[in-house]
Design a protein with these regions (language model features):
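Extracellular protease catalytic domains of secreted zymogens
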Residues: 171, 175, 179-404
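Bacterial N-terminal signal peptides
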Residues: 11-25
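A short catalytic or substrate-binding loop motif that flags glycine-/basic-rich loops and adjacent residues
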Residues: 11, 106, 304
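N-terminal secretory signal peptides that target proteins for export/translocation
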Residues: 1-12
Length: 404
């Protein structure tokens, strides 16, 4: 099946009630065209950057209900406080309701680097406004790029960049933050940008790099895995928004922590009920090219001889972002990756590279009591969601900072 058709939900992992429309965007910073779908009664709007096209990486985010600017955070979307409450990163009220879960994380060390495409001229101002609104300490942000020429603005990537820096900072506000912008003119984040991000984090003493973009897997990816091997850096990537069986790289790399997507069910009062796999989104797959890494030997009955992913998962929909003077509701594994990266940074276990981090997390499966204390095992949302590791959500989502 054509991967472009599958990623639009017309094949193996359809969105409920999916329909396709191509029309002009009203979102002021969006691309000239977009696709829409409907899921659980919500309109899902994909910017041009999230529509896979041959020869370029794509983002993994979408707007929810509307891509029109709003004067305040959309009603009901998760906040840094509500997400941190559900994941037991902070103390919060019973049920972790969005409206009253206001305590936010306070940790972070070293540095977090975000790799995206194109310049984001209002990055510092937007991050400051977001942080102030939610009571998050101001960020120490540096915007940089490979080489000497500042990249142009890619309007459909601005939502991605806002999402990445705002939520990574929200989870680990004490970490130095870098936004590394690719200077490639075709909007692809380049390996030069990834290498720059890793070097900056390493010079800061260590930390994490988050990459919320990707492309279908190809055989030459084996030669790219070397870019994610810095022993002072743990690399994270989105597992994609296309459901199960749709591959994506760099999420497929055994040297990257691939982050899938979940969804919080809440009652009419906004209280948390449970967390489920986000049906039709939060991609997972067995890599056709990457062999099973040693840290997955314990789940070989599921992955066989292949690298299986995602490794972990985080809430997929929906979050608030602040962009160019306005608020938007947004979702996707583009949210999940920087969020989980920030959580791992704040956990401050300071693993010596991605493989060390993954080895630590997968080792939790051997101790059921420890595993239940440290991860939320997601077993609902699709028939493939099982007890323990699965291709829906990997090991599961965060439960406290332990084991990360």
């Amino acid at each position: 099946m054509n991967w472009f058709v599958r990623i639009l939900g017309l094949g193996a992992a359809p969105f409920v009630g999916f329909f396709l429309v191509l029309w002009g965007a009203c979102f002021p910073a969006a691309a000239q065209s977009r696709y829409e779908s409907v899921f659980n009664g919500h309109k899902i709007i994909y910017p041009q950057s999230s529509i896979p096209q041959p020869g370029r990486h794509h983002t993994n985010y979408f707007f929810v209900d509307s891509d029109a600017p709003q004067s305040s955070p959309p009603s009901g979307v998760e906040t840094p406080g509500s997400l941190a409450c559900v994941y037991k990163l902070v103390s919060g009220p019973t049920g972790c309701p969005v409206a009253t879960s206001t305590a936010v994380p306070t940790g972070g060390w070293g540095a977090i680097a975000i790799v995206d495409a194109g310049d984001y001229p209002t990055a510092a101002a937007d991050l400051a406004a977001f942080s102030s609104y939610y009571g998050i300490p101001p960020a120490d942000l540096t915007v940089t790029w490979p080489g000497t020429k500042k990249p142009p603005v890619y309007s459909d990537w601005l939502g991605e960049e806002a999402l990445d820096i705002e939520w990574a900072h929200a989870m680990a506000p004490n970490a130095k933050l870098y936004l590394v912008e690719s200077s490639q003119v075709n909007t692809d984040p380049t390996w030069a940008a990834v290498q720059l991000a890793a070097s900056l984090v390493a010079k800061a003493g260590g930390g994490v790099v988050s990459m919320s973009w990707g492309d279908p897997e190809v055989s030459q990816e084996l030669s790219w895995d070397k870019y994610f091997t810095n022993k002072k850096v743990v690399f994270f990537a989105a597992s994609g928004d296309s459901g199960l069986g749709v591959s994506i790289y760099p999420g497929a790399s055994p040297n990257v922590v691939a982050v899938g997507g979940t969804h919080f069910n809440r009652d009419s009062n906004g209280n948390f009920i449970n967390e489920v796999y986000y049906t039709g989104g939060g991609g997972g797959d067995l890599s056709p090219f990457e062999p099973r890494p040693s840290y997955q030997n314990g789940v070989s009955g599921i992955v066989g001889s292949h690298r299986g992913y995602p490794d972990v998962a985080s809430d997929f929909c929906c979050a608030a972002i602040y962009l160019q003077g306005a608020w938007y509701s947004i979702g996707g594994t583009s949210w999940a990756s920087p969020t989980f990266a920030g959580i791992v940074n704040a956990a401050a276990n300071k693993a010596k590279g991605s493989v060390a981090e993954l080895t630590m997390m997968y080792s939790e499966l051997a101790n059921p009591i420890e595993y239940a204390d440290d991860f939320n095992d997601i077993t609902q949302g699709a028939p493939q969601c099982k007890v323990g590791f699965d291709e829906c959500t990997g090991i599961g989502s965060a439960r406290t900072y332990a084991g990360k």
